[in-house]
């Protein structure tokens, strides 16, 4: 799709010049790291988390995804040699548990994407409800040798999100966020993602900068590192100049609960496969209600289709608890 006319380009300032880095030293620092990541995302729209996963976990994800590597397809709108594999929840249990259910990412997505809605329910009754985010899509991203530059873009265009310029971040600005974990070395020369830190606060009416903009920064990572980004930040995949190095990322995207999912979770996985997932994941992927009572089946909680004995929402984890049996990071900022 092309646009015949658009507002002219306009230089927009940023308050940050580099991608912030959060170092996760041990599980005891999860709360601190979540707080640091949230603060960094407010300022820059993107941050790198060092040591999110240990090497054995990374290797296990790669091993589980390896049978699907040859099935990686190119997609319309992406550069040549840029391939993806979708539907990862059933392809890699380790990905589902350690990446989708990662405690730090859970805290980040809940902070930025939990929707609060208030209204008069009826005469004399004021109502306030909160809906946690939902899974948007799951992808393994492969940038093969010879892959070209992806165009700078914002991911929230798929959700038809639109923002005016802002001097500082306010909750409600974003419709989605993502975390991408490095499964290989991710260096500038082999196609790592590039960003314009601070562009999440820009006015959407103006065109994106050119690929040689001096404010562009590259998310260079080692296996087990990750970057988190808000869907409002301008970014793109890059040229892989190497002749023998394939850059691989495992990505998870989240969105507000009332939006249509980019990846159709209900057709991607058959119901018998969904029944093998833990309750928190079933709810997060969409078998739950977005307040007020959106997404019902026969006027009931959709999780009852998966498990007729499921507890009503609010009496179990409600989709908020990753890695069942583990402590949940609560982001209180």
UniProtKB/Swiss-Prot annotation:
Chain spans, region Disordered: 309-333
Known EC number: 1.14.11.-
Entry keyword annotation includes Glycoprotein: no
Pfam families membership: PhyH
Disruption phenotype: Abolishes the biosynthesis of communesin B and leads to the accumulation of communesins F, J and K.
Residues that coordinate or bind Fe cation: 153, 155, 235
Swiss-Prot/TrEMBL cofactor(s): Fe cation
Pathway: Alkaloid biosynthesis
Comp. bias (Basic and acidic residues): 323-333
Alphabetical UniProt keywords: Dioxygenase, Iron, Metal-binding, Oxidoreductase
Keyword set includes Iron: yes
InterPro entries: Phytyl_CoA_dOase-like
Single GO MF annotation: metal ion binding
GO term, biological process aspect, one: biosynthetic process
Subunit architecture: Homodimer.
Function: Dioxygenase; part of the gene cluster that mediates the biosynthesis of communesins, a prominent class of indole alkaloids with great potential as pharmaceuticals. Communesins are biosynthesized by the coupling of tryptamine and aurantioclavine, two building blocks derived from L-tryptophan. The L-tryptophan decarboxylase cnsB converts L-tryptophan to tryptamine, whereas the tryptophan dimethylallyltransferase cnsF converts L-tryptophan to 4-dimethylallyl tryptophan which is further transformed to aurantioclavine by the aurantioclavine synthase cnsA, probably aided by the catalase cnsD.
Record family assignment: Belongs to the PhyH family.
Protein name: Dioxygenase cnsJ
């Amino acid at each position: 799709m092309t646009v015949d006319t658009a507002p002219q380009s306009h230089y927009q300032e940023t308050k940050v010049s580099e991608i912030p880095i959060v170092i996760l030293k041990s599980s005891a620092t999860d709360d601190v790291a979540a707080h640091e990541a949230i603060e960094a995302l407010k300022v820059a729209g993107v941050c790198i988390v060092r040591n999110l996963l240990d090497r054995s976990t990374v290797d296990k994800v790669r091993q589980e995804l390896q049978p699907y590597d040859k099935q990686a397809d190119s997609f319309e709108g992406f550069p040549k040699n840029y391939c993806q594999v979708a539907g990862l929840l059933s392809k890699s249990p380790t990905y589902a548990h350690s990446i989708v259910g990662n405690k730090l990412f859970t805290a980040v997505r809940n902070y930025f994407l939990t929707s609060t809605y208030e209204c008069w329910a009826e005469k004399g009754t004021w109502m306030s409800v909160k809906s946690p985010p939902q899974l948007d899509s799951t992808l393994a991203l492969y940038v093969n040798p010879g892959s070209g530059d992806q165009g700078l873009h914002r991911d929230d265009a798929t959700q038809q999100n639109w923002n005016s310029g802002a001097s500082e971040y306010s909750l409600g600005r974003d419709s989605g966020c993502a975390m991408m974990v490095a499964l290989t070395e991710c260096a500038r020369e082999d196609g790592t993602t590039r960003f314009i830190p601070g562009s999440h606060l820009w006015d959407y009416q103006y065109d994106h900068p050119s690929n040689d903009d001096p404010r562009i920064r590259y998310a260079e990572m080692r296996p087990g590192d990750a970057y988190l980004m808000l869907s409002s930040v301008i970014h793109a995949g890059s040229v892989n100049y190497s002749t023998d190095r394939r850059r691989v990322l495992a990505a998870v995207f989240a969105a507000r609960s009332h939006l249509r999912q980019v990846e159709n979770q209900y057709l991607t996985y058959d119901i018998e496969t969904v029944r093998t997932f833990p309750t928190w994941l079933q709810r997060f992927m969409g078998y739950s209600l977005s307040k007020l009572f959106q997404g019902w089946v026969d006027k009931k909680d959709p999780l009852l289709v998966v498990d007729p004995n499921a507890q009503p929402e609010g009496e179990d984890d409600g989709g908020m608890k990753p890695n069942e049996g583990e402590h949940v990071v609560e982001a209180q900022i």
